Curated annotation (Swiss-Prot):
(R)-carnitine binds at Y486, S488, T499. This is Carnitine O-palmitoyltransferase 2, mitochondrial. GO terms for cellular component: mitochondrial inner membrane. It comes from Macaca fascicularis. Keywords: Acetylation, Acyltransferase, Fatty acid metabolism, Lipid metabolism, Membrane, Mitochondrion, Mitochondrion inner membrane, Transferase, Transit peptide, Transport. The keyword Cell inner membrane does not apply. Residues 1-25 form a transit peptide. The modification N6-succinyllysine is found at K69, K85, K239, K418, K424, K439, K510, K544. Its main location: mitochondrion. Belongs to the carnitine/choline acetyltransferase family.
Length: 658
């Protein structure tokens, strides 16, 4: 019913619809305070969103076994099949019934929301590389606007405009339009805003529009993940009005909203940022930011020491800041340098626990680096797109703008931290660990220029399926096997939906990959095209199922979480090595494309894996791959390129070169 909801759509055009908004605004509602003035309130659809379905247990088991088939030999598969049968007719059935009953008692949320927060917040590994991803902005099309001060000012103002637009209910609701000509119109919006919010979703559904969950948006601003022993906490203070700025590992704060909730004038923000950029303070000997890259239990203990050493107020300022702006003192050399800098940097100039860091380098290269427990990038991508659009189309200042004559020495406060010997030792240890880990990470990227979405759609193939098939072929060529593969899919079409997994490795991709890699000369171009079409069709089915909450991963995860919560001995299905193997995602993949995104990326989720960020554009395909020493990212990309060349040859009726 709904295609994959990866929120690829560029947010609607200037949404200053006719008619003033029909709700009270904050005192600061003058010109330039908002990105848009939606006539449909931002949260209009939230109450009536459908609930995330719990799949039938037999469907989950069937899908699980289908995903296991290409990964196991016949003997292993028969064992796993038996474990599944026992589970489905025994303890699994009981757990499923309990999960359904529990879900009925909690209609305000989804069955996955609580367990998913638990999973993220209980993880003790560093958030850096293990969880936090990044998305890099395209440069401003007007090159002179890429000056660091100009871009930092414009992006900060646009970010605060987004905050105000969201909080005053004037941000267009996030809606996936299957037929925009019918639903993405002022006429429809004028009608739907009068439908009570308890029914509004149904009104949108009638015109093939699918409103998406926006419950994660409130954590975008003024929020931080706080380290605590055994399970972290999310902290939000939406009363705070200050911005946190990091430069050379030094911390600065100044207000970006005044007491009435107005945005401080752009020329004042420019003046304060100019003051920070020209501050000659040296980098601190013990950069505090390293601590946010530590193991969470170690960081929790050190944070307690920080608090008891007289730093409570300074930490509160860091945690409650609207967001963290990181100003880097060097230009970006190339795309690989961009990825390394935005994914981890040198550890001194990021607060990795903040809901997001907006990073701007000396040459204006910019990115959002975000903490993953509070949300899945749904809110981040919308924010990202709107900030790019606003800051490039309606910039608050020009490169010629003069900063205000504000007294930044008074307004900008530099935070100083009192460090005991124990804290200094902790920072030094964190730095050593950080530096050693980062040395092990390799990143490389590919731009395949022969074609993209337009050509593949003419061939009646899913562009995403072809990209995923290329990864399967590449891994088979490089390592001779088919491995567990993960593709993230948003379930934001449902209330408090998070993500579901698409499992791109299938019996179809395995057969097709083996034909292309091992014996291309034995097949005609027509036969290879036929196999690609089968892969595309099956991938499309998996994608649709995942977007509708009909995968198997989250359901099995929730049943396991429930068993643990009830103190039940772990069922044998979960002790089966095949279950461990399918959740050891050697290929972890994620896609997004938007006119604002230059590239995105993340680290592998296992030590012998690849982290694959990719995008299929109109006429080219981009791929950004990370690996640790156990795998070779550059060679993998050479194999991806070979796979794409071979598939394009087959589609053009040419024979495959071995």
């Amino acid at each position: 019913m709904v295609p994959r909801l990866l929120l690829r759509a560029w947010p609607r055009g200037p949404a200053v619809g006719p008619g003033a908004p029909s709700r009270p605004l904050s005192a600061g509602s003058g010109p330039g305070q908002y990105l848009q003035r939606s006539i449909v309130p931002t949260m209009h659809y939230q109450d009536s969103l459908p609930r995330l379905p719990i799949p039938k247990l037999e469907d989950t088991i069937r899908r699980y076994l289908s995903a296991q088939k290409p990964l196991l030999d016949d003997g292993q598969f028969r064992k796993t099949e038996q474990f599944c049968k026992n589970f489905e007719n025994g303890i699994g059935k009981e757990l499923h019934e309990q999960l359904v009953a529990q879900d009925k008692q909690n209609k305000h949320t989804s069955y996955i929301s609580g367990p998913w927060f638990d999973m993220y917040l209980s993880a003790r590994d560093s958030v850096v590389l293990n969880f936090n991803p990044f998305m890099a902005f395209n440069p401003d099309p007007k090159s002179e606007y890429n000056d660091q001060l100009t871009r930092a000012t414009n992006m900060t103002v646009s970010a605060i405009r987004f905050l105000k637009t969201l909080r005053d209910g004037l941000l267009e609701p996030e809606v996936f339009h299957l037929n925009p000509a019918k639903s993405d119109t002022d006429t429809f919006k004028r009608l739907i805003r009068f439908v009570p919010s308890s029914l509004s979703w149904y009104g949108a559904y009638l015109v093939n529009a699918y409103p998406l969950d926006m419950s994660q948006y409130f954590r975008l601003f003024n929020s931080t993940r706080l380290p605590k022993p055994s399970r972290d906490e999310l902290f939000t203070d939406d009363k705070a009005r200050h911005l946190l700025v990091l430069r050379k590992g030094n911390f600065y704060i100044f207000d970006v909203l005044d007491q009435d909730g107005n945005i401080v004038s752009p020329s004042e923000i420019q003046a304060h940022l100019k003051y920070i950029l020209s501050d000659s303070s040296p980098a601190p000997e013990f950069p505090l930011a390293y601590l946010t890259s530590e193991n969470r239990d170690i960081w929790a203990e050190l944070r307690q020491k920080l608090m008891s050493s007289g730093n409570e107020e300074s930490l509160r300022k860091v945690d409650s800041a609207v967001f963290c702006l990181c100003l880097d003192d060097f230009p970006i050399k190339d795309l690989v340098h961009l990825s390394h800098n935005m994914l981890h940097g040198d550890g001194t100039n990021r607060w990795f626990d903040k809901s997001f860091n907006l990073i701007i380098a000396k040459d204006g290269s910019a990115a959002v680096h975000f903490e993953h427990s509070w949300g899945d990038g749904v809110a981040v991508l919308r924010f990202f797109n709107e900030v790019f659009k606003d800051s490039t189309q309606i910039p608050a200042i020009t490169p010629q703008s003069q900063p205000a004559t504000a007294d930044s020495t008074v307004t900008v406060q530099k935070l100083n931290f009192k460090l005991t010997d124990a804290l200094k030792t902790g920072i030094t240890a964190a730095k050593e660990k950080f530096d050693a880990t980062m040395k092990t990470l390799t990143i490389d990227c590919l731009q395949f220029q022969r074609g993209g979405k337009e050509f593949l759609k003419k061939q009646k193939l899913s562009p995403d399926a072809v990209a995923q098939l290329a990864f399967q072929m590449a891994f088979l060529r490089q390592y001779g096997q088919t491995v567990a593969t993960y593709e993230s899919c948003s379930t934001a079409a449902f209330k408090h939906g998070r993500t579901e997994t698409i499992r791109p490795a299938s019996i179809y991709t395995k057969r097709c990959s083996e034909a292309f890699v091992r014996e291309p000369s034995r097949h005609s171009a027509g036969e290879l095209q036929q196999m690609m079409a089968e892969c595309s069709k099956y991938h499309g089915q998996l994608t649709k199922e995942a977007a509708m909450g009909q995968g198997f991963d989250r359901h099995l995860f929730a049943l396991r979480h429930l068993a643990a919560a009830k103190g039940i001995i772990l069922p044998e299905l979960y002790l089966d090595p095949a279950y461990g193997q399918i959740n050891h995602n050697v290929l972890s993949t994620s896609t997004l494309s938007s006119p604002a995104v230059n590239l995105g990326g993340f680290a592998p989720v296992v030590s012998d894996g690849f982290g694959v960020g990719y995008a299929v554009h109109g006429n080219w395909i981009g791929c950004n791959v990370s690996s640790y020493p156990g795998r070779n990212a550059r060679e993998f990309l050479q194999c991806v390129e070979k796979a794409l060349e071979d598939m394009f040859d087959a589609l053009e009726g040419k024979s495959i070169k071995s």
